[in-house]
């Protein structure tokens, strides 16, 4: 970004609204990629500017006319420069992301929350489960946002948050503590189901790595800051999904269900397993690539995935 723009912003912009407008203009001029919780320059600017001022996203309109100190202007401008020049996702600049309307800590150890599964949680999996779940598993938990959101949605349920990485689980545990959910959400290190105790869950929710090799090669620069461990899943993006499909029925109650996100790799899944009765879920807020299977359906199609059992 040209120095003249930086100097003008620091010296001539005075209010929160000024800084929001300037940030949107810089984002538009830079043609950055959106996809880490926002899809437009205004929301991206809000998620950068307000947290940089230690303000909530829903501040009253009249507060936006408040004047900024020099240090506040410098802090915002510095982050805008890094977002534009280095293409770092806003969430990694502020260490804040939102999921199901709640704030989470994130850094480069975990993916930025953005799963459409959040809509299912907000609707309490209406039409997908037939009773209040007592035990929920969030497989490949990352920041822990799905597990914690499920705990809010079902306050009487016990939720296990599983990931293979200790670094990831450190972030998970931080968010569990920030939300005061230590009594309800348990972080567990496991390579998928391999190291889990023999628990039967009413609901397994999973957003595993699912980006195929072709998409990995074409990812916008912003996604290069996210951990490859949380994205890449082999040539067809199904490396982990197959293992989950193979092992999930052993960990489900008789009336339990599996909900799994595979994103763009849904094409590979449908092509390779046309006989599996995936229910592909629809979302009012956008998103796709999420399927549901019951335990019985998983048992019925077990032969397709038996070679991938742990």
From Swiss-Prot:
Q: Which UniProt keywords apply?
A: Methyltransferase, S-adenosyl-L-methionine, Transferase
Q: Which GO terms describe its molecular function?
A: nucleic acid binding; protein-glutamine N-methyltransferase activity
Q: Which domain of life is it from?
A: Bacteria
Q: Which CDD domains match?
A: AdoMet_MTases
Gene Ontology, cellular component aspect: cytosol
Query: A biological process (GO) annotation for this entry?
Result: methylation
Briefly state the protein's biological role: Methylates large ribosomal subunit protein uL3 on a specific glutamine residue.
Q: Which Pfam families match?
A: MTS
Q: Which InterPro entries match?
A: DNA_methylase_N6_adenine_CS (IPR002052), HemK-like (IPR004556), Ribosome_uL3_MTase (IPR017127), SAM-dependent_MTases_sf (IPR029063), Small_mtfrase_dom (IPR007848)
Transmembrane residue ranges: none
Q: Which reaction does it catalyse?
A: L-glutaminyl-[ribosomal protein uL3] + S-adenosyl-L-methionine = N(5)-methyl-L-glutaminyl-[ribosomal protein uL3] + S-adenosyl-L-homocysteine + H(+)
User: What start and end residues bound the annotated signal peptide?
Assistant: none
**Protein name as it appears in the record:** Ribosomal protein uL3 glutamine methyltransferase
**What Enzyme Commission number does this protein have?**
2.1.1.298
Query: What family does this belong to?
Result: Belongs to the protein N5-glutamine methyltransferase family. PrmB subfamily.
- Is Methyltransferase given among the entry's keywords? yes
């Amino acid at each position: 970004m040209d120095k003249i723009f930086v100097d003008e912003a620091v010296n001539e912009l005075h209010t929160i609204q000024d800084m929001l407008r300037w940030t949107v203009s810089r984002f538009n001029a830079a043609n950055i990629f959106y996809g880490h919780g926002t899809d437009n320059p205004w929301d991206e600017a809000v998620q950068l500017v307000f947290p940089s001022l230690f303000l909530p996203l829903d501040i009253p309109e009249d507060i936006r006319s408040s004047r900024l100190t020099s240090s506040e202007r410098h802090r915002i401008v510095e982050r805008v420069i890094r977002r534009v020049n280095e293409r770092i996702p806003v969430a990694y600049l502020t260490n804040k992301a939102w999921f199901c309307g709640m704030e989470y800590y994130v850094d480069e150890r975990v993916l930025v929350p953005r799963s459409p599964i959040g809509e299912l949680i907000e609707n309490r999996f209406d039409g997908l489960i037939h009773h209040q779940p007592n035990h929920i598993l969030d497989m490949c938990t990352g920041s822990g946002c799905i597990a914690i959101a499920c705990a809010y949605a079902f306050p009487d349920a016990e939720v296990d948050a599983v990931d293979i990485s200790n670094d990831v689980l450190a972030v998970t545990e931080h968010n569990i503590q920030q939300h005061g959910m230590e009594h309800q959400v348990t972080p567990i290190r496991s390579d998928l189901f391999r190291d889990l105790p023999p628990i039967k869950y009413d609901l397994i929710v999973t957003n595993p790595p699912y980006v195929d090799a072709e998409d990995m090669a074409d990812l916008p620069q912003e996604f290069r800051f996210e951990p490859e461990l949380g994205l890449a899943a082999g040539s067809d993006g199904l490396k982990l999904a197959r293992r989950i499909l193979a092992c999930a029925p052993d960990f489900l109650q008789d009336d339990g269900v599996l909900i799994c996100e595979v994103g763009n790799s849904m094409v590979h899944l449908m092509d390779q397993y046309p006989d599996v009765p995936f229910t592909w879920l629809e979302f009012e807020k956008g998103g796709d690539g999420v399927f549901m299977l019951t335990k019985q359906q998983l048992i019925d199609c077990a032969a397709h995935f038996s070679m991938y059992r742990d």
